[in-house]
Swiss-Prot record:
One example GO MF annotation: sodium ion binding
Any one GO cellular component localisation term in the record: plasma membrane
Family of this protein: Belongs to the sodium:solute symporter (SSF) (TC 2.A.21) family.
NCBIfam families: Na_Pro_sym, sss
Subcellular location: Cell membrane
Database matches in PANTHER family: SODIUM/PROLINE SYMPORTER-RELATED, SODIUM_PROLINE SYMPORTER
TM segment ranges: 16-36, 54-74, 85-105, 139-159, 174-194, 200-220, 240-260, 286-306, 327-347, 381-401, 410-430, 438-458, 467-487
Function per UniProt: Catalyzes the sodium-dependent uptake of extracellular L-proline. Since most S.aureus strains are L-proline auxotrophs, this transporter may aid the bacterial persistence during an infection of tissues with low proline concentrations.
Name under which the protein is recorded: Sodium/proline symporter
Any Gene Ontology biological process: proline transport
Annotated organism of origin: Staphylococcus aureus (strain Newman)
Membrane topology: Multi-pass membrane protein
This protein's UniProt keywords: Amino-acid transport, Cell membrane, Ion transport, Membrane, Sodium, Sodium transport, Symport, Transmembrane, Transmembrane helix, Transport
Length: 512
């Protein structure tokens, strides 16, 4: 019987083409980083938001690639492999959430952030939207971004380290440092433009990989009959409603709630050239997402038949895609498929690093230096932004040094944190004139606290009653909505300018 490490080491050691393909991929990213650096004007908005000049197709794939991360290629197939088709509920929830996000959040956010003081970060938008003169809302929301995104970013570094450990038999820490070096390089120098272009490039690679692997796997197994074989091995494998409890299904489906408040995703809407381009972006983005997620599910299902057929001992389900790509393909193609995993991982890391850097620079450093200095010392602020990328990356690497957690748990905690803190607030800010600063702060903080308390003290009680195992975004989101609404009703109403701005945003969005 082959062990995963033996099978992969034999192939990689014998075929240097795999290493060449990875090296070429890294070289392309470095070139894009230089291109972004050459295009930069020394303006903070250019570095952090691409000067709001990004087209619909780059917007669509960069949003998708930065969203899906290594989770789509490593964790989702592994989850389907372990539990069967019932794991697909998360893909349904995510696709629905992303689709609604394009309609409900994207157009208004693009228009409103420019109208409200040309805000380039979410905390800056909240401040301008609610006339937060003492910056309490801006500071708290900025802190939430820095804390949760550092956690989120470290999950990407964990994925990178695990990839090199599994595929090449290299030390986990070496892989972590290598991935970190490349992604820091093009993010540090190229800024938002480089990150967006690399995300587009990486999104294409990811899509090809997620279509190619399950098709070739079926060709090498029993064709479409592979799914019959999978069902014969265990009937629940192809049952959407078996293998998980009702609470489990609801928890997976509820991931879609998080989309409205994920800064690294909705910043894509802020950077597009015009809100009128969003329908094109939506059509491409949702199509890309649907095909990619279905491909990931297909990898997991075919893997159920593939592993015993090839006598492979799969020690970690999250490495299923790696094993299949190395066993089924020529090393050159295998290198391309490993590059797809790196693409998924690095696209998310770079986006998260840049958003966190934006928050540190725009939401904190600007408070120290002052608004006037920010206007007259743009190059200084760009340099602070670059240094912030480096600092956040170093902290995330330090946390990722101990990889004792699953990718989904790491991502799930951060996703829930943003979903409960920001999703209700973003929706209220874009649609409700009655939102107050006190309501916004209270709702945001209560959502984050509920998520933290649920993870730390409630979830461990799941063995007593499964309701305690509910995904933390649900109670966090509900509490945040209630607190935001109640506190806003009880506190001083904002000025008339809010209703005027909301009406103006609505009218602009309706323009054809």
């Amino acid at each position: 019987m082959l062990t995963m490490g033996t099978a992969l080491s034999q192939q990689v050691d014998a075929n240097w083409q795999t290493y060449i393909m990875i090296a070429v991929y890294f070289l392309i990213l470095i070139v894009i980083g230089f291109y972004g650096y050459k295009q930069a004007t020394g303006n903070l908005s250019e570095y952090m938001l691409g000067g709001r000049s990004i087209g619909p197709y780059i917007t669509a794939l960069s949003a998708g690639a930065s969203d899906m991360s290594g989770w789509m290629i490593m964790e989702l197939p592994g989850s389907v492999y372990s539990t069967g088709l019932s794991a697909m509920w998360i893909t349904i929830g995510l696709t629905l959430g992303a689709y609604i996000n394009y309609f409900v959040v994207a157009p208004r956010l693009r228009v409103y952030t420019e109208l409200a003081g040309d805000a380039i970060t979410l905390p800056d938008f909240f401040k301008n939207r609610l006339n937060d003169k003492n910056n309490v809302l801006k500071i708290i929301s900025g802190l939430i971004i820095v804390v949760f995104f550092t956690l989120y970013t470290h999950s990407g570094f964990v994925s990178g380290g695990k990839l090199f450990e599994s595929a090449f038999g290299l030390d986990y820490h070496f892989g972590l440092i290598l991935v970190a070096f490349i992604v820091i390089f093009y993010t540090f120098f190229g800024g938002y433009l480089a990150v967006s272009i690399t995300d587009f490039f990486q999104g294409v690679i990811m899509l090809i990989a997620m279509v190619m692997v399950p098709i070739v796997a079926m060709m090498n197994l029993n064709g479409w009959g592979t799914f019959h074989d999978v069902a014969a091995m265990k009937p629940t494998n192809l049952n959407l409603f078996k293998g998980l409890s009702f609470i489990g299904i609801i928890s997976l489906f509820s991931w879609g709630l998080g989309y409205f408040g994920q800064p690294h995703i909705i910043v894509r809407f802020m950077s597009i050239k015009s809100h009128k381009m969003l329908p094109k972006a939506r059509r491409l983005g949702i199509s890309w997402m649907a095909v990619g997620l279905l491909g990931a599910v297909a990898v997991g299902l075919t893997g159920i038949a593939f592993v015993p057929a090839y006598h492979i001992k799969l020690e970690d389900p999250e490495t299923l895609f790696i094993v299949m790509s190395q066993v089924l393909f020529h090393p050159l193609v295998g290198g391309f498929l490993l590059a797809a995993i790196l693409a998924a991982i690095m696209s998310t890391i770079s986006s998260q690093l840049l958003v966190t850097s934006s928050s540190l620079t725009e939401d904190f450093y600007k408070l120290i230096r002052g608004e006037e200095k920010a206007k007259t010392h743009q190059k200084e602020f760009v340099m602070i932004g670059r240094l912030s990328v480096l600092v956040v990356a170093i902290v995330a690497i330090a946390i990722a040094w101990n990889p004792n957690d699953t990718i989904l748990n790491l991502v799930g905690n951060a996703w829930a944190g943003f979903g409960a803190s920001f999703s209700p607030l973003v929706l209220f800010a874009l649609y409700w004139k009655g939102l107050t600063r006190a309501g916004a702060v209270s709702g945001m903080v209560s959502g984050a606290l509920v998520v933290i308390v649920w993870i730390a003290w409630i979830k461990p009680l799941a063995h007593i009653n499964e309701i305690f195992g509910l995904y933390e975004i649900i109670p966090g989101f509900i509490v945040s909505v209630i607190v935001t609404y109640v506190v806003s009703k009880l506190t001083k109403k904002p000025g008339a300018f809010v209703e005027t701005d909301l009406n103006k945003v609505r009218d602009i969005v309706r323009e054809k």
